[in-house]
Amino acid sequence: MVLTNKQKEELNGAILDYFDSSGYKLTSTEFTKETNIELDPKLKGLLEKKWTSVIRLQKKVMDLEAKVSQLEEELNNGGRGPARRGKEDALPRQPEKHVLTGHRNCINAVRFHPLFSVIVSASEDATMRIWDFDSGDFERTLKGHTNAVQDIDFDKSGNLLASCSADLTIKLWDFQSFDCIKTLHGHDHNVSCVRFLPSGDQLVSSSRDKSIKVWETATGYCTKTLTGHEDWVRKVIVSEDGTTLASCSNDQTARVWNLAKGECLLTFREHSHVVECLAYSPANIVEVPGSLLSTPEGKAKAKAGAGGTSFGQAGYLATGSRDKTIKIWELATGRCLQTYIGHDNWVRSIKFHPCGKYLISVGDDKSIRVWDIAQGRCIKTINEAHSHFISCLDFCSHNPHIATGGVDDIIKIWKLG
C-alpha cells in the first residue's frame, strides 16, 4: 500500500516526535536534516497511539476469527445458528458476562437463587459467597464451616440454603437474615452433596462414608440412611416429583432409589471410572433415539413403570464420569441409550437444558460442551472457558444464564443467546 504525501509527512512527524520524546537526540537531529521537518505539537504521542490501536484491532480480529470458526463448527456439526434459535433454546455464548473473584481456593459448587438475581458459590476456602449475577457485584460472605464447603442448595422458596462440608456437617441458613439456624450431624466422613426435596420439608445428603441420608429440615433429625454403594457417594439428586433419588459413586456405578422404601431400584454399571455427576431429564425432553418411548406400546409400558416401579416424569438419567464420557440411561428399562464422547478429561458436572433438547457439560479439559440429544453429539464447544479445571455448573431457572466455577478460584456468568 502506497502512502500519500500527507500520510508520509504525518508518519515522519510522528517518528520524529517519538525519537525526541524517547531521548534519541542525535537520531532526532539527523532525521530532521534528512526529512526537512520540524517537531509538531499536534503529533505528540501519535506513534504510540497508532501502535496500541493496531494491537487492539489485531485482538478484535482474532476474537472475531475464533467466533466465526466456532459458528462454522457448530453449523457443520448439524447445530442451529443463534439467529435460528428462540429464547427458550438459547445456548451459552462468549464472552462471559461476568468474572467473579474473591474466593481463595477452588470453587466446588454454584447455585442460582430460584427467584432473585443472586448466585451463591461454595469453595475449598470454607466459605460461601453471595453475588448479584446481573451486576457482578459481591454482596456478602457466609462463614461457619471449618473445612471445604462441598455443595449448596436452595429450597423452592429460596428462603432456606443448605450447605455441606468436609467438616462432616450440613448447615441450614436463613437466607433473609443470613444466620445459620441448624447444624446437622450424622455422617462419618466428608459430606459431598446436599439436595432439598420439592416439598422443602426434607433434604438428602451423600458422603464419603458410602451412605445417603434423609433429614427433616424442621428438626434436623436423620430419618433414613440408604446404603449399597461400595465407595464414596459423590452426588445425590431428587426427581421432580420427589419419589426417587439418583446417586453416583467412586464405585463406578449410579443407582436409583425409591425414597419412601429406601430400596435400590436400578444400578448402572457401564462406566469404567468414578461417576462424578448425574442429572434427571426434564419432563419436556425430546425423544432419545432407541427409547422405549418411541412407540405407543413403549410409552404405555413406561407410564406403568418397569418392574412395577414408576419413575414419574423423569424418563432418563444422565451420568458423567472420569472415564471422559457421558451416558444417557432409560429409567424404564435400565438401558444405556447414548454415550457422548468428546471431553478430553474428567466430566465434572452436567445439566439438562430447560428446553429439553440439549445437555450441557463441563470438565477438567476446561471446556463447556453442548450436546444435542436427538442427534447424540456435541454441537457447540467453548474451549478454555476457565484457565484451570471446571468443577461445577448451574442453570438459572428464571433468567437466561448459566454459571461455572473452577479450580482457578473464579466463577463465570454466561448469558444464553
Swiss-Prot record:
Subcellular location: Cytoplasm, Cytoskeleton; Cytoplasm, Cytoskeleton, Microtubule organizing center, Centrosome
The keyword Coiled coil belongs to this UniProt entry's keyword annotation: yes
Region annotation (Disordered) ranges: 72-93
Chain ranges of the LisH domain: 7-39
One Gene Ontology term, aspect cellular component: centrosome
Keywords: Cell cycle, Cell division, Coiled coil, Cytoplasm, Cytoskeleton, Microtubule, Mitosis, Repeat, Transport, WD repeat
Domain of life the protein comes from: Eukaryota
GO MF, any single term: dynein complex binding
Annotated S-S bridges: none
Any one Pfam family match given in the protein's UniProt record, by short name: WD40
GO BP term (any one): microtubule sliding
WD repeat intervals: 102-143, 144-185, 186-225, 228-267, 270-339, 342-383, 385-417
Family label: Belongs to the WD repeat LIS1/nudF family.
Job description of the protein: Positively regulates the activity of the minus-end directed microtubule motor protein dynein. May enhance dynein-mediated microtubule sliding by targeting dynein to the microtubule plus end. Required for several dynein- and microtubule-dependent processes.
Domain notes: Dimerization mediated by the LisH domain may be required to activate dynein.
PANTHER family membership: TRANSCRIPTION INITIATION FACTOR TFIID, TRANSCRIPTION INITIATION FACTOR TFIID SUBUNIT 5
Name of the protein in question: Lissencephaly-1 homolog
Organism annotation: Heterostelium pallidum (strain ATCC 26659 / Pp 5 / PN500) (Cellular slime mold)
